[in-house]
A protein has these predicted regions:
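Short, surface-exposed beta-edge/turn micro-motifs
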Residues: 15-16, 37, 45-46, 66-67
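Short histidine-centered beta-strand/loop micro-motifs
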Residues: 8-9, 30-32, 59-61
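Histidine- and/or cysteine-centered catalytic micro-motif in compact active-site loops
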Residues: 13-14, 21-24, 45, 53-55
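A contiguous catalytic/ligand-binding core that recognizes phosphate-bearing ligands
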Residues: 4, 30-44, 49-51
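Conserved metal-binding segment of the jelly-roll/cupin
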Residues: 42-62, 72-74
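A short beta-strand-loop-beta hairpin characteristic of the jelly-roll/cupin
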Residues: 16-40, 82
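Single conserved hydrophobic/aromatic residue that forms the stacking wall/gate
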Residues: 1-7, 11-12
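Accessory, usually C-terminal, subdomains that scaffold auxiliary metal cofactors
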Residues: 61-132
Length: 132
């Protein structure tokens, strides 16, 4: 099971859509069923705390015109990884460590997401589209 070692994130944004899920719903093989995600409209000027027990997609714009967002992360988050870390092997994550894309940043991608080949593509189900 994925553990959460970092703190919450704080987001203050223009109107945007935030797609969230629960860390507890990640399967033993680190896959995640996208049907468990929920989309929320966040009105402009609203502060949102995304708890460390949450999964989230990158925020999405509402009107196709883009948006601005300020995200406050725990110190060191998204810094380059230091030391040796496990890698995705033949499409499988041998451990949680293989999901680390940067310091304090675990990544589970979708096959349609355009991620680098070495990324773990464990999002199972429909690639969510907020325009529908």
């Amino acid at each position: 099971m994925l553990r959460s070692l970092v703190g919450s994130e704080m987001c203050i944004r223009d109107s945007a859509i935030l797609i969230l899920g629960l860390l507890a719903d990640v399967a033993e093989d680190f896959t995640y069923d996208t049907s468990k995600m929920e989309a929320f409209l966040v009105p402009a000027g609203t502060g949102v705390e995304v708890f460390a027990t949450s999964l989230h997609y990158a925020p999405c714009g509402v009107d196709g015109q883009g948006f601005q967002v300020a995200i406050v992360l725990p110190q060191g988050t998204n810094y380059p990884l230091e030391g040796a870390h496990q890698k995705v092997e033949q499409g499988k994550a041998p451990s949680e460590d293989a999901l680390l894309a940067a310091t304090n940043k675990w990544l589970i991608g979708h096959a349609e997401g355009g991620l680098p080949e070495e990324s773990f593509l464990g999002l199972v189900g429909e690639n969510l589209d907020v325009s529908k």
